């Protein structure tokens, strides 16, 4: 797992961010959703499944344009049954247990493309986000 910039990690999935502060994009290869997820919000459910869950997306107030694009991308992936590709964002300094409401633009991060996982949006109601990532066989 190599440390990358977010732009490099997105390029690993042939996805291009619309703007410098966007954390989701659609892959030009297969239309899958590519998302950058905070590592501390990933939970190991066992059996090779990791869950990314945000209880209240409305707390993401520092960057409403990127939040709205993320919501659009989540709706697309859920409605079109598209795969979700994972990029893990980790704080370089001290991870906060609760990241909601924090301006992520001010946090020093490193990114890791997690190509051995494929996800699915299992819940998205406008506020609650739940994506399950399964380990790909033979990875």
Model-derived features: where do they sit?
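Short helix-coil boundary/hinge micro-motifs
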Residues: 1-138
């Amino acid at each position: 797992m190599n440390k990358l910039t977010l732009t490099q990690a997105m390029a690993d999935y042939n996805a291009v961010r619309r703007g410098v502060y966007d954390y989701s994009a659609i892959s030009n290869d297969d239309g899958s959703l590519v998302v950058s997820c905070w590592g501390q919000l990933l939970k190991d459910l066992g059996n090779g499944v990791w869950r990314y869950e945000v209880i209240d997306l409305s707390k993401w107030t520092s960057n409403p344009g990127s939040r709205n694009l993320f919501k659009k991308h989540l709706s697309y992936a859920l409605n079109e049954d598209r795969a979700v590709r994972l990029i893990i964002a980790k704080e370089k300094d001290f991870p906060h247990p609760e990241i909601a409401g924090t301006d992520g633009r001010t946090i020093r991060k490193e990114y890791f493309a997690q190509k051995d996982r494929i996800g699915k949006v299992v819940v998205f109601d406008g506020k609650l986000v739940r994506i399950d990532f399964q380990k790909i066989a033979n990875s």
